[in-house]
Amino acid sequence: MQFKKQLMVIFLAYFLVVNESEAFFGHLFKLATKIIPSLFRRKNQRSRSIMKRDLENLFDPYQRNLELDRLLKQLPNY
């Protein structure tokens, strides 16, 4: 009877440790799968944000108005 109780305690302890370690390593794996791609994406996003900023500057409405004003001032009636 004592031997069965010891086996049961060992089995339950092993079961808890395995489940906890599985949950722990599963959580680490989830974090790794989210962090690792984001490291590679940052380089692309930086260049993309620079390109986006260049496009915003290129098509900035205030900039267009300044150029339009400059061109209109060249006309004699403006």
From Swiss-Prot:
Chief location category: secreted
A GO term from the CC aspect: other organism cell membrane
pH dependence: Has great tolerance to the acidic, neutral and alkaline environments.
Secretion signal span: 1-23
Record's comment describing the protein's domains: Amphipathic and cationic peptide with an alpha-helical structure.
Cited function: Antimicrobial peptide with potent activity against bacteria. Acts by fastly disrupting the bacterial membrane. Shows activity against Gram-positive bacteria S.aureus (MIC=1.5-2.9 uM) and S.epidermidis (MIC=2.9 uM), M.luteus (MIC=23.4 uM), B.thuringiensis (MIC=2.9 uM), B.subtilis (MIC=2.9 uM) and Gram-negative bacteria E.coli (MIC=5.9-11.7 uM) and P.aeruginosa (MIC=5.9 uM), as well as against penicillin (MIC=2.9 uM) and methicillin (MIC=1.5-2.9 uM) resistant bacteria. Antibiotic activity is not affected by major negatively charged components of the prokaryotic cell wall (e.g.
Family: Belongs to the non-disulfide-bridged peptide (NDBP) superfamily. Medium-length antimicrobial peptide (group 3) family.
UniProt-recorded name of the protein: Antimicrobial peptide marcin-18
Organism: Olivierus martensii
